[in-house]
Amino acid sequence: MNEQLKGFFNEYRKLIDARLPSYIEDLSTPDTLKQAMTYSLKAGGKRVRPLLLLATLDGFNRPIEDGLDLACAIEMIHTYSLIHDDLPAMDDDDTRRGQPTNHKVYGEAMAILAGDALLTYSFELITSMPAVREEPAKALTLVRELAKASGPCGMVGGQVADIEGENRSLTVQELADIHHHKTGDLLAYSIIAGAVLADASEEDLEHLRMFAIELGLLFQIKDDILDVEGDSDKLGKPVGSDDGNNKSTYPSLLGLDGAKKMLDVHTMKAKEHLEAVKMDRTLLLALTDYVAGRDH
């Protein structure tokens, strides 16, 4: 990771880490629910999605503060999806980010409700953002696109396709389609939302959308590679968990070398789309290299 990106990440990851639990503290809801919500929000993580939004805003020379609430709302939705993914009925994982998963601490019922609460509260947070208070059309766009990215035609639909793809060998295209929705749609939204807040042109929005799709794909390819040859201590979960869940992965379909070649191809395509956008691309280019080269 280059020094500029590292500095940006460190500064704003700390800000996001501190800000996320602050939204929950004053909610008029049972303490157990607040504790369960906060537990997973404070479990750490790369914060790639909120940082993508903030890096996009920065590239258009817009104030970072304008996007902080939205960035945190996206992370709440991502966190809800992880809580539910870890449940016994889904991936049945006991650890996440090096800690016991939510249902191991609070029980399955409370974990489900904590996820539900994070999902629904995120939309309340977006509609009360100062940055869109005087622009209802922009708020509507942001909410509609987030609902689409995280709902039945996006992340949830991708999760269903992933479950239905277990215990059978998928084609590479089927796997790409699953991860386009399961992982890529929310990543793409993070970038597009930053551009919408920055009043980007339709041409720039389209190039950023294509960049984001490629970035989401290479993010998942890298995840699959790390599941084969990563360090479980750095990953915060057991290596080889996908094999244990009988899931098709890029290495299982293409071999490890084939998956790495595919990673290189989509990294190049992502950069080509980004180069067409009229903005300061420094951070997003560096972030692309980071996603492709990360070790966790």
Identify what each model region corresponds to:
Residues 1-18:
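N-terminal leader/targeting segments and the immediately adjacent pre-domain N-terminus
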Residues 12-14, 21-24, 28-274, 279-292:
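Mg2+-dependent prenyl diphosphate-binding active-site environment of isoprenoid biosynthetic enzymes
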